[in-house]
Amino acid sequence: MKNEANIAFYNTSPKYEILMAVLIGIGICLTRLATAVSQIALAIATILAAYLWWKNGKRLNLNDAARQYIKVVCMWFIASFVSIIDVDNKAVVFYYFLGDWIWRFMVFVLVVAFINRREYLLKILTVFFCIFSIDCLIACYQFFLLHWERGRGFHGDYLDLTAIICMVLAMSAIILLDSHFEKNIKKFALLGLVSSIAGLFGCFGRGAFLVSALVAPFYLYYYLRNSKKMAAIILIILCLLGGAVLSSPKYVERLSTTLNTTTNRSNVDRIWTWKASWDMFKDHPVNGVGLNNWGWYYRNAGYKYDEEKQNLPHAHSNYMQLLAETGIIGFFGLLCFYGFSLIISFRRWIKHHNPLDLIFFTAFLSVMVLFGFFQPTYRLSSVLRVLWFILALTIQLRESIFIGEKYEKQL
């Protein structure tokens, strides 16, 4: 049976499956540690994928869930791309769309089309947990020992890492709490959970604390009501974390400004950019000002309010940025994409209690819906690649889960 599965891999040698898994794994795991290496690995994987697609009669081997989700994402992409119709810089918008939208989504396509073996998926996840943990620990070192204003991890904006933390924290907790996962991956999930919590403190981000707190009830309620012992352990951990926060004036002061919309400059300026985005939408309601054109219109077309003092480069919101850039058409596509991602996964979770559906739901809710409220996460390269990987991972692993039984490895 194993040999039959190997031969069936796009009518080529089974070695290609291993090579694809290695390349995709490098591309995902090194997206923050070594961006250039990550990009090269994904480019080679994409070229190899084109060869395998051609070798397989110009067909991709996709399960129904992956095929359906790709269609939904493409509908959102097309609705957003309509914004190119009446812009002056069509070439620039087209290049941005290919580079920042299509290219990043290739991570999802590569995983669902070319990594079917459970062991390969879990090995990639294991390496990801390890590198992610180093990223978080570096952020702690930067914040606590080097006394940086905020820890950033390997590189980039600190918000990149905090957005990823929100996803990984929920995913790690679900893997640990669910009885079906193997002990080996649970060990690395524990590493991911501890590192995520440390990263929350090291990155010193208000949004990450808020998002993590809002998402936690979705997975804690189900697991804790079925285990008094686990409920007691989690309660103790939460009390310790709460005590650590409350005992530190620095964290209390920082978190107390989360909802301050009157005197906190960061929050106030965000609101002014949202007002500017609304003005852009009112002037270009159908298909917006064009993808990635928000910054030019904000600086040069009179939309910036004098009250906004930081000269922010974007609208600090998935919703307001895309409303301004893609208009009603693109925003409707965004809402359909959000609705499908949340409703379908949550329905499946309620019906089957499949932990992979819950991971899908919490990852999307964390990054795109909640974190995206105050940061345009769809623009963040490393964040999007990790999100697409986690969503693809859940779809692929779901095929090997049988409710009420232990996992069965795919051959």
Regions found by a protein language model. Name each.
Residues M1-V92, Y96, F114-T126, I175-K187, ...:
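Transmembrane signal-anchor hairpin modules in multi-pass inner-membrane enzymes, especially those
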Residues A21, I44-A50, I174, F337, ...:
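Transmembrane alpha-helices of multi-pass inner-membrane enzymes
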Residues I26-I28, M106-V107, E119-W148, G153-L224, ...:
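Alpha-helical transmembrane segments of multi-pass inner-membrane proteins
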Residues A36-K55, L98-V109, D160-L169, L210-P217, ...:
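Membrane-embedded alpha-helical segments of multi-pass membrane proteins
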Residues A91-V92, E149, G153-Y158, C203-A208, ...:
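Membrane-interface catalytic loops of GT-C/OST-like multi-pass glycosylation enzymes that act
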Residues A198, G202, Y223-T263, K275-D283, ...:
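A membrane-periplasm/extracellular boundary helix in multi-pass inner-membrane enzymes
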Residues Y221, K228, I328-V369:
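Hydrophobic transmembrane alpha-helices and their immediate junctions
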Residues T261-K275, N287-T326:
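Long extracytoplasmic/lumenal interhelical loops at the membrane interface
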